[in-house]
Amino acid sequence: MIDLDIFRENTEYYLPNLQCLGKVSICKRSKYMSLLLERLEIKHPIFLAPMAGVSTPELAAEVSNQGGLGSLGLGANTAETARSQILKTQALTEQPFQVNFFCHQSIELDPTIAQTWIDFLRPHFEQYDAEPPTQLHCIYPSFLDNDDFLNVVLETRPKAVSFHFGVPHPHQIQALKDAGILTMVSATNLAEARAIEAAGIDFIIAQGIEAGGHRGIFNEHFDSALRTVDLVQLLTQHCQCPIIAAGGIMNGTQAQQMLSLGASAVQLGTAFVQCKTSNANDAYRHALFHEHITQISASISGRPARGLLGHWHTQIDLPNRPAVAAYPYCYDLGKQLHAAATKQGDQGFGAFWAGTNVSQIRAMEAPDLINQLLVEMQQVSY
């Protein structure tokens, strides 16, 4: 019989093997895990990945109530809807959770590139008896653009806030620190991780190439494409703050491997998309269990993102494909094409984000999945 109560309250159960990790030993990493659990006030080193469009207050609360760190992906929200989502989550749980925003560099849309991209996709609109838009809009604001999102976070005071695509402005980081709100930023290579540390961020999320959804790369034109296992080892050896492993983690065995390499926690997204409390539609849920090939494409949104193989990969990402419009303008067009296709019963242009190990997905609700992960993690520990 596995005593989950003992397992949940003892960090050493997660890091049983003492081994050298180069510059930073596993002993020191064990202390980092203890620090992370203590500062976040959570029982387990298991995070729900913040997934814009899929995250819900209900799913976040379920994970947090089970001792992990729930999350809200708010990058696609306005300040008002972000506030509403946070308040709703706080009404469902008294436990800590994180909120996530995008920190991309906003750039001016190149009209020539945009028009070329619209024209390239025009035949695909026409096959669904639709016309593409004449203009593209910036549908996802950046946290860097103004302090509207910052003010919402300062008002609602979630336990932690994480960022994708870059680092917030210094004054924003300082305001969060002054409010006692912990900060996390995704890194895909050592240079990004060092920039994150230099900015005074509390935790680094090591996003491996296996991860579903958007790559957290700061520069959309450069990707080191490191596997999660390699990235975790690299960052734990060279960084002096807790590392959260993300990408391709679907079960407790994989989670425990990351912890044994020095990660202080693991973050899972794809594994939770199938939960009833996620916002995934029926087509997305069906695809998760039946379409197990994933591929990275920038055609959907304008930035590289990994998803289940669909029309974007087989019909759009061709050798003659022109340059895509800038993110998130490109995503405006992509969503409209998906909407047109859906009206005709075709879900092939959906952005069904998923990691490389999606074939290992299990039909489980969040509380049961957390418990199953813990059981599997302990079994590896002995």
Region spans (language model):
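Cationic, amphipathic, low-complexity segments that mediate targeting or membrane/lipid association
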Residues: 5-12
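Low-complexity, intrinsically disordered or signal/transmembrane-proximal segments
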Residues: 13-14, 19
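Active-site entrance/lid segments in N-terminal catalytic domains of soluble metabolic enzymes
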Residues: 31-238
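Conserved active-site-proximal phosphate/metal-binding subdomains
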Residues: 214-244, 249-382
